[in-house]
A protein has these predicted regions:
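Short, well-ordered loop/turn and helix-capping segments at boundaries between secondary-structure elements
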Residues: 83, 106, 130, 206, ...
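Inter-helix linker motif
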Residues: 109-126
Length: 214
């Protein structure tokens, strides 16, 4: 219908609109949802890219439906942003999406890749029962709120030594992913607060989930 065509045209215009040349921070996150296709329920992921502009505004600049994460997939997404005018991004903050680190290194070699701290904490607490969750979360906070990487690393060793005998798998990802967790210590306190609080993109994702349920 004409209405459908108009909506699809508007979506296409939005997905291809020109972007700013420079963004201080971009967040990439996935919203998982279910769709019915051929009388079957299919799981899909919508990848949302939320950018913080130079004047502090939040702007959703891309929404992609993806099935197969890979460095090739993410390189295509990032190159699309470049084709729309993006020349430089200071920090890209994302969870451990398959291939994202390699793609960022190719498309934006000067950009700092930062593992999402909120996701990192949540994934860790999955290994911890409710009775210890509050104390464990407080200990994790001493790592990412430390004033320097050296002190953060010392706290990482302390927390691991304290909890590893009880929950041997909980801290493994912090040790294995320290190279992409630790960039946060390079930034000012204001930038760090933006990175370890994902309210902006999480509220957006909860809205998408509500719309999907309708």
């Amino acid at each position: 219908t004409d209405v459908t065509y108009k909506i699809l045209q508007d979506i296409d215009d939005w997905q291809n609109r020109p972007l700013d040349e420079i963004y201080p921070i971009m967040f990439i996150d996935a919203v998982h949802f279910s769709v019915r296709e051929d009388n079957r329920i299919k799981k899909l992921a919508a990848y949302v890219i939320l950018a913080i502009t130079l004047d502090g505004r939040k702007d959703v600049i891309s929404l992609q439906i993806g099935e197969n994460e890979s460095s090739k997939y993410w390189l295509g997404v990032l190159n699309e942003l470049k084709n729309r005018g993006v020349k430089d991004v200071m920090i890209i903050c994302a969870d451990g999406l398959t291939g994202i680190k390699e793609a960022i290194g190719t498309a934006f070699p000067d950009t700092e890749y930062q593992r999402c701290i909120v996701h990192q904490v949540r994934n860790t607490l999955k290994y911890v029962p409710y009775k210890d969750m509050k104390a464990f979360a407080a200990d994790l906070k001493t790592i990412y709120l430390a004033p320097s990487e050296e002190q953060g690393r010392a706290q990482l060793e302390r927390v691991t030594e304290k909890w590893e005998p009880k929950y041997p798998n909980a801290m493994k990802s912090w040790i294995q992913n320290w190279d992409v967790i630790s960039p946060i210590f390079k930034f000012s306190n204001d930038v760090r607060k933006v990175i370890y609080t994902t309210n902006a993109i999480e509220s957006l994702n909860s809205t998408y989930k509500k719309l999907n349920r309708q």
